[in-house]
Amino acid sequence: MQRRAGLAVLSVLALISAACSGSSDDAAPNSDAPTVAEAPTTDPPTTDEPIENPPATNAPDEATQPSLTDSLAVVKPGFVISPGVEQVSITGATPGSTISIVTTTMADQRMPVGAVNAPPDGGEVDGYGSFLFRNLDATTDWRLVVDGASITEPIDVLARDEHPDPAFFAEQSLAPGVNYIEMRDGTTLSANVVLPGPIEDGPYPTVVEYSGYTPADPNGTGFKDLFTPLGYAYVGVNMRGTGCSGGSFRYFEYVQSTDGYDTVEAVAAQPWAFENHVGMVGVSYPGISQLFVAQTQPPSLAAITPFSVIDDSYNSTLYPGGILNTGFAVKWTQDRVDNGKPAITPTGEIIETGGQGWAKDAITAGDDVCAANQSLRMQNPELVAEIFDSPFVDSSDNTDGLSPRLFVGKINVPTFIAGAWQDEQTGGRFPTMLDRFTGTDKFYVSLMNGLHTESIGPANFPRWVEFLDLYVAKRTPTLDTARVIAPILASGIFGTGELALPADRFAGMAYEDALAAFEAEPSVRVLFEEGAADGTAARTPLPRFVEEFESWPIPSLEATEWFFGNDGSLGDTAAETASQTEYLALPDGIPATFLAEESAGNSGDIWKLDVQWDWQQNAPGTAANFITKPLSETVTMAGSGSADLWVQSSVGDTDLEVTISE
């Protein structure tokens, strides 16, 4: 964020209406299937071979110059072409050669003599022999031009809704340990399968965690240690272009969503997966990914539990309020760029910097698939540079595709979403999209004050277990095992002592009765004053009280208006005369972070009970302050707010932050 000192002037005619964590890895067939989705399975030829009977072309007339197909040899290329969802990847090509892509129409077009055709898109093959074309129209046939001397036959790319036949997934077998799941374009994703017992004792209710972190790391810790004691099979899957997964990584491009579809279907097809359906779990990144995957409507997806999520990548996280989020979003993105770097050189030597450590360990131990899957990593885009180059929302750059609020209406499975308004990583805007989940009538919400991990705190954990038991395991919920796990979870994340979970609410009920009772409850639960429960230490992640509502926004909510007064007052009527107030905008006048030095070394410390804060009030004259008279009755602010301001600044750019407090 660029910091400027300047004089900001606010008109008093203003109206207020109130109604992840990502850390770097080393820190801790069938005939109905679309044949275009199959990558070559044999070694490619090492030289370009002319096609025996190339398509006939007419000689150009005198008024035109030859087309590309007139003038270039049509060949079978000496590399692997893998058409994917709106993509074409090239592997095994000669490093340094040039590859361009043109539409078949462009390739066949004869231009008037002297005219210049539009230059094809493309570039130079990288040192790994790879190149990737993105954002291709699936309704168009494409051809590759190699070194300006030869051209391929037409290539069909896959549309977003061209899903494989179920037989494609049924033919894949996954066993406990590290596996590779094949996607519709031939890319393989690394997956770690952990079962709660012997495979012959299955089937087991199954959950999938899917992200660009390290869920497929067999030696990592995380949700696999949480769900297997609860009786669930756990499958952690690395997104393409991360860890040991093949392909190239770009933040939530659509192929990651269809990869999620393929992952769900492949896992659900396993004989050890209960009822051949799976649920999805995850907080933050693997929570957000559930929204992207569920929009594709995988037939075997039972339910999702997206916790600590965003409603819009740009407005909630990258540029909240139009201000670049250098505190979290830029660093998080840089971590993803670094994690997505190749683990090995083109000749197979381990690269010390970048990449994911567990992938390097796997390659060193002889995992040849992991090694081969590093080949497209140099095609990962420079995401941080794109952020700085895109300070404004532009739907033509696919920002709409990165906005869950625009597609959550497509989600048609039971959904349980939870999060906190003061989430320091993903922000507090996600409740603004809750009324957009119109595709499912099994929709449950837990809202609370607090930070990023509050959603999996002990206050919400029992409801999470109940939801998964009812909609994935399809059994009467019990918290017996959860009572053992919850204190360990709370201690590790929040630094708490012993915490007791409530009694089983559905004890003695048949499954159908428990499900009916759960569905009869209000769907929205708000945990008030989290961290201030009576009889507990300060900041213990428990609420003082809980209220339930039928929907969000709360139907009985009444919008409240407050007006700035001439004398620094805040009242329910507008001032009769206009005036203004001035302050010196001095961003450097307060600390860049509100953590004390002893708590600033580890980002996880912010969630602990003993966190030390260093919150400082703005110095006199560096903020405009307005205050109400003492309220005559208790008022609860619930929902979104807005501030209408008329601003004049002595500098070209100034940031504004509006805080409502008591």
Language model features with spans:
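C-terminal motif of bacterial Sec signal peptides marking the signal peptidase cleavage site
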Residues: I16-A19
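Bacterial signal peptide processing site
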Residues: S21-S24
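A catalytic-pocket lid/entrance helix-loop region that shapes and gates access to the active site
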Residues: V255, A266, V281, Y285-W358, ...
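N-terminal cap/lid segment of alpha/beta-hydrolase-fold proteins
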Residues: A159-G202, I627, L631-E633
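Extracellular mucin-like PTS domains
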Residues: S31-N58
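C-terminal, loop-rich substrate-recognition/catalytic regions characterized by aromatic stacking residues
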Residues: P458-E662
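Accessory cap/linker subdomain of secreted extracellular hydrolases
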Residues: F292-I411, L479, L499-D504, M509-E521
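Cap/lid segment of the alpha/beta-hydrolase catalytic domain
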Residues: L189, P198-A269, P620
